Amino acid sequence: MVWQTHKVAAFSSNAFDLAEWVSLHPTVRAESPALFTPMLLRLPLILLAGIMALGSSVLQTEKAKWIWRGVALLVVLRLNAPTDFYPWGGGSPNDQQLGRLTAFGLAAVFVIILGGRWLRFFWKPATLILLLASLITALEGYHRAQKVLHSIQIETKLGGGLVLYVGFLIIPMLFILLMSGLMKQKERASFPDALS
């Protein structure tokens, strides 16, 4: 779904396309670190894959765990750089960023998969941190991209994709916080003397 809309269809784009568009602008290429705005727009995919891999650690059946882990890996591979990038180091700075993010995402998902048994004990706070990081990077990336587009007089409007993405992140955050609060209330009700 589109994160921004414009009367010209070429300027209506999702986060991935928006990252590609703004990466062409000289001020974005000169950012420190390089291509920071496109990275902020691409990083939510990596964080989403991390959330999925982390969520797989609390699933009951092995089949469900491996399905979620596989989907997490596919989400990361969505960022894969063009074949011109390989072997490592070739291509444009944009392709280099895609390659690095893909490598980082794959490494992160594999670490989460390997640490699955231990991660299930603190998956709620870890998931909240990843959800919040994804929300912040998506909104900051969108804001910075809009500033770039406005500087070259391309006026765009907020698209439904960004609204849905933000809602997609906020709902599980609220659910985890609500469930944690209910569990604490249940503990207090079960052991009222032990907690005072």
What are these regions (language model features)?
Residues 1-196:
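Compact integral membrane and secretory-pathway proteins
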